[in-house]
């Protein structure tokens, strides 16, 4: 049997120790009883050959090796081959030791699914079992079950790549540092991937080939000495121990990177395999001297340089003055000329960053080094940020004068006493001297204009006003101002900005809400009482309440199947006399729920009782009234009531869905509250005449009407008016024939019940949409 091994990437010694610890129980049982086979429970925990094949394939693809040569490290022991009379689930001791350490073994693996070249079989008479021979043992019931894969990473570290793969590369280092797993950890992680061998970084020790004389030997617990896997087993083991016990340095964590596919430091070719026969090695274990101490790791690289210092990395010949590139640029004064920077004068010519203490030294440096060294007629300024954009001059002196702007040299000083101004150009000094002498040699050339100026530029600006050519227009929307010179336009734009700031301040101060304003919006104002129906009919007002009525919408009882509809509110009844103008309620009288044939016009319910039905109210002014209850309500059976704690025997009532109630019912849609309360009166039917109530009458407070006392007709009317005024509740008067309205006899068989329905909505004026009524 032939075994493959990588020449470059060698797993750490943790895999060897893991494999030895897993094999050792089987080896001990095999040594105690030579003819006993390893039970399936022990071999099931080992890695299958299929895992080894997949790992080898992935490594072969990543290394792209063309030449292959296989060999075993020194000290491997060749034992007799596998017995032909072994059982299906058993392996001999020789078969166990003939495999390299770290090779996965399992009797449940599907060996016949692997190609023969993975096992290195070169001839049919090989003494080692081929996949064909071993395929006879792969037909057990558990043959399709693949064992867990173990890799150099999964043995010693136990990394959960499902969690780390979605994070940054540096998270892998923090995870390894925090896990503190032992290299000899025996519990394989179910989520570990055995093919993750291509990641190399400072967190994973990089293998380095060592001479064959320095290969260490690991001793299994059973007493058998197994050689270290790979060429760098001892070094990898020591490095992993340093990584686990010492932890990572802060600098390493900050500059940690994961490198993919980089060759080793001493490797000459990547991924070359070597093949040799296993029987050529000696059959005894060789004890080798220990490996030399681990060389010190190189210091981690420093942080990347700042952006402005990149030029120093490419120009190491520059002196220590190159470290001053981060200094800010020099500022320009009012005359457009440059001042010095903190006592230092920096040369910003291309590929130069010299610093000088004196300005004269910088001027001499520019002239001798940068200008005089130019050959031919090329007089171009290469100063960084020069607005000329490498436009050349036609003379040397012009370039020298121009360089004064960059160097800050001002040789032309004012000669007047007390004036300390200096200029880089002589022309500017002459113009400045005219301000002292009052000389204005530049006269306006427009006929009839006698203005004179000290410089030609000011005269040119003035002459544009005569020609009415104002090319500089204000670009602010709504502004039509135009100017002859850009300086005037700049001043105008500044004035615009100051005006906008003032307008913003005023707007900010005006938008702030005054506390009194907010208090007025949140205060519940008292409601004004509405006039009686008699007053409304006498005044001839149809469909609206006289005077400024409160914005309370009374909601009479409606069936539950109407509560889900929204949009319109059914009015009470048609008006007592024909209405000349159509109301919103008349537009929907022909609806299927409110047919017009079932709503006869009513002028008065009872002529002797002086009770009037209210006309169709206006959508915006609906006042609480006393209206008669529909006759269909009197024929309904009501559920038991609950006693209210108010003291006036208020009873709650839950309406039921009844088809007989729909035509004459008064329906209000779009409201939230649907609480109905009923109050049985305590006065005889003869006293039910409602006296006319004036709109100016004083209404007592609602709290005064809740005292639990025996009430007569007058007190109950007062209660009705107070209750309707303060809460917007419609009061229904029931006839005397409804003595058993609620399924029970009330206090007196001749007494009727007046029920109250509380489902009103108080709203802010002009904030709710109109509520339309149905006739």
Curated annotation (Swiss-Prot):
Ranges of biased composition (kind: Basic residues): 134-147
Stretches with biased composition (Pro residues): 289-307
Residue spans of biased composition, Low complexity class: 123-133
Keywords, in A-Z order: Activator, Congenital hypothyroidism, Diabetes mellitus, DNA-binding, Metal-binding, Nucleus, Repeat, Repressor, Transcription, Transcription regulation, Zinc, Zinc-finger
Gene Ontology MF term list: DNA-binding transcription activator activity, RNA polymerase II-specific; DNA-binding transcription factor activity, RNA polymerase II-specific; DNA-binding transcription repressor activity, RNA polymerase II-specific; RNA polymerase II cis-regulatory region sequence-specific DNA binding; zinc ion binding
Record field: compositional bias (Basic and acidic residues): 497-512
Zn finger spans (C2H2-type): 345-370, 379-406, 412-436, 442-466, 472-496
GO biological process: negative regulation of transcription by RNA polymerase II; positive regulation of transcription by RNA polymerase II; regulation of transcription by RNA polymerase II; transcription by RNA polymerase II
Motif placement: Bipartite nuclear localization signal: 491-507
Disordered: region residues: 121-147, 282-314, 485-512, 529-665
GO cellular component, one term: nucleus
UniProt family annotation: Belongs to the GLI C2H2-type zinc-finger protein family.
Disease: Diabetes mellitus, neonatal, with congenital hypothyroidism: A syndrome of neonatal diabetes syndrome associated with congenital hypothyroidism, congenital glaucoma, hepatic fibrosis and polycystic kidneys.
Protein's name in the database: Zinc finger protein GLIS3
Taxon lineage: Eukaryota, Metazoa, Chordata, Craniata, Vertebrata
Gene name tied to this protein: GLIS3
